[in-house]
Regions:
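Active-site substrate-recognition segment that forms the wall
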Residues: 107, 115-123, 209-211, 217, ...
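Extreme N-terminal leader/targeting segments of oxidoreductases
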Residues: 1-32
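Dinucleotide-binding Rossmann-like beta1-alpha1 core, especially the glycine-rich loop
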Residues: 78-160
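Helical element adjacent to the flavin cofactor pocket in flavoenzyme catalytic cores
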Residues: 137, 141-145, 170-230
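C-terminal catalytic lobe of FAD-dependent flavoproteins
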Residues: 307-309, 314-424
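N-terminal Rossmann-like FAD-binding beta1-loop-alpha1 element of flavoenzymes
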Residues: 30-57
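Helix-loop-beta segment of a Rossmann-like dinucleotide-binding subdomain
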Residues: 21, 118-128, 161-195, 199, ...
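Glycine-rich FAD pyrophosphate-binding loop
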Residues: 50-70
Length: 427
């Protein structure tokens, strides 16, 4: 992946200026080698550096090249699986730990932004929008469940109230989370990378990890160098490839498509989202959108299984945008791109250890902006010998996709077709 540039996205076009970073050449020795300079890797590196570890980060392309620099930019707390489903699959102590941690990622982001003065257009407020009474009942139930874990900041919105925060007639109500919000995701990653370097960490770009030499003193090999470490953190997620085959077997890269309009102007933008909150609906195959600092609308949705890039992203997403906001029918689309996320069969993150010294976290299944920041803290705690929260994730049950890697894409696509049909029929 030598000299791999960022995709032609709005985020890349509006990224903060950063100095070039070196390619790994020769041999380096460190305490922890982190594979991947996305949110999981950068969050892990920051927590470790703050606790006295020497850290080297290997990035196959550029900081935030993958999902961390392409996502919708929404700070969505909790997990991709509802907490009541988690409660039924694990014991009460494990469920309690997972429930307590579910909103921590958003707090970590805000702490990082404040501590390191990261310029990433942070805004408070996120809305889950209900398209029908079943969705609304589900939001009411989830609010009650989250309150049991101490998350009392959630506010139900009736049909009148949701019209005050989003000018879309499709919604019957919603749930407002002021601990949610939105950011410029690539600039958040770039700011975190700068924080890593300010603490003495090293980041090598265009340095693909091609092989991990396991053992008591593991070594990560690249084309032009190698890193000897006491510990390794594997944080490649959907862009890891087959570097660790046992991780690839239980997950699948999937693509989501995003478009960005031309600037709308202050007046039109304010009519769409008067409070400047971000929004996602409650469908299984959901749509999500928000405004940018320069008053564009970013709108995303859809899933392409197997990480294939569709030929015409605008043709897929623009009709979804116009269904929500028909008044934008004459607005030009300036950017369109795909970003991959890593799906697990359970839709819960996979966290664990390979041997005694290789740690990993992957498979956010669409809730990566917040979860990855929590994961970095949990991984760092485990390396310091405090593994209770790590174990709460590591003990979650996970299963390979039926049919293995060959059949996982059609299997998942069939499931998505079923849930998409349910969305259309309002089930």
């Amino acid at each position: 992946m030598a000299n791999t540039p960022y995709p032609q996205s709005y985020y890349a076009a509006s990224a903060n200026a950063v100095p070039p970073r070196p390619v790994l050449q020769g041999e380096v020795e460190t305490d922890v080698c982190v594979i991947g300079a996305g949110y999981t890797g950068l969050s892990s590196a920051l927590f470790l550096l703050e606790n006295g570890f020497r850290v080297t980060v290997l990035e196959a392309a550029k900081v935030g090249f993958g999902a961390s620099g392409r996502n919708g930019g929404q700070i969505v707390n909790s997990y991709s699986r509802d907490i009541d489903v988690i409660e039924r699959s694990v014991g009460p102590k494990q469920a309690q730990l997972l429930g307590e941690m579910a909103f921590e990622g958003g707090r970590i982001i805000r702490e990082r932004v404040a501590k390191y003065q990261i310029q990433c257009d942070l805004k408070d407020g996120g809305v889950f929008a209900a398209l029908n009474s079943k969705h609304m009942g589900h939001l009411e139930s989830q609010k009650r469940l989250w309150e049991r874990y101490g998350h009392t900041q959630l506010e139900l919105l009736d049909e009148r109230r949701i019209r005050e925060v989003v000018a879309c007639d499709n919604y019957v109500g919603g749930l407002l989370d002021m601990s949610g919000g939105h950011i410029h995701p690539l600039n958040l990653a770039l700011g975190e990378a700068a924080a890593v370097e300010s603490l003495g960490g090293t980041i090598y770009e265009q340095s693909v990890a091609v092989r991990i030499e396991r053992g008591a003193n593991p070594v990560v090999h690249t084309a032009q160098g190698k890193v000897r470490a006491k510990f390794i953190i594997v944080a490649g997620n959907a862009y890891l490839g087959n570097l660790v085959p046992e991780l690839a077997a239980k997950s699948m890269p999937c693509g989501t498509q995003v478009i960005t309009t031309a600037p709308l102007g202050d007046e039109l933008a304010k009519t769409l989202l008067p409070q400047d909150y971000c929004v996602e609906d409650c469908n299984y195959l959901l749509d999500y959108y928000r405004l940018t600092r320069d008053k564009r609308l970013i709108f995303g949705g859809g899933v392409v299984y197997g990480a294939r890039d569709p030929a015409n992203i605008e043709a897929i997403i623009r009709p979804k945008m116009l269904k929500a906001f028909p008044q934008l029918k004459d607005v030009k689309i300036d950017y369109a791109w795909t970003g991959n996320f890593l799906l697990t069969l359970s839709r819960l993150p996979q966290v664990g250890r390979l041997g005694d010294n290789i740690y990993y976290s992957q498979g956010c299944s669409g809730h990566g902006v917040t979860y990855t920041h929590l994961a970095g803290k949990v991984l760092a705690e485990a390396l310091r010998g405090q593994a209770e929260r790590f174990d709460a994730f590591a003990d979650l049950p996970h299963y390979p996709f039926p049919g293995g890697q060959l059949l996982r894409t059609p299997f998942a696509a069939l499931g998505a077709w079923y849930y998409g049909l349910r969305d259309k029929l309002g089930f």
